Amino acid sequence: MKASATGALDFSGVAVGPDDILGHDGDYERQPYFSGGAWRFAAVHAGGMARLFDLLRAHLRETGRGQDPHQAARLGQAAIALETAKLWVDQAALAAEEPSARSTDAIVAYVNLARLAVERAGLDLMELVHRSVGLQSFIRPNPIERVSRDLATYLRQPGPDRALTTAAAWIVPQAVTAQDLWR
């Protein structure tokens, strides 16, 4: 994940001809590609989380606090959060990129859950890092401040409640056990 900025572009006066148009009406939001593609930004989130995790480990080594039991517990919890995010991303990518094995609705449901699981794991990891490092993690030029700020911003993807309820709506009527729900 790289530092980013938000801005605006003015396309007033730019002519768009028929040869400039890609695809057809409705292509952009066609499922499962639209929602299913969300695994890609979840992968970026996981990358930001990995960077933050590495910065935490470096901080603990540099300060000699890595053996403190409270710091070790937070580092262990951070490792769990990071691995959780990576596992969800990997499975969401498989579901979305090999769609023939699953229905469109199943793909959308799974990727929606994955993006929310990664968001939760990212928020948890940031809290653990901030608690471990303390005030330094909020002050520039500490790299933890920048990575945390970027990750916190990018984790906020649109429609999280809709993503969750859409997934739940697919899950409810499924006539299989939890073990077979995503197979």
Task: Name each region found by the language model.
Residues 47, 76-83, 112, 116-123, ...:
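Generic structural signal for well-ordered, non-transmembrane alpha-helical segments
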Residues 46-54, 76, 86, 90, ...:
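Predominant activation on well-ordered alpha-helical scaffold segments within soluble catalytic domains
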Residues 42, 68, 75-78, 107, ...:
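Hydrophobic packing residues in well-ordered alpha-helices of helical domains and bundles
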Residues 135-183:
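Glycine-rich phosphate/cofactor-binding loops in nucleotide/flavin-utilizing enzymes
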Residues 1-83:
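Glycine-rich beta->alpha junctions and the first turn(s) of the following alpha-helix
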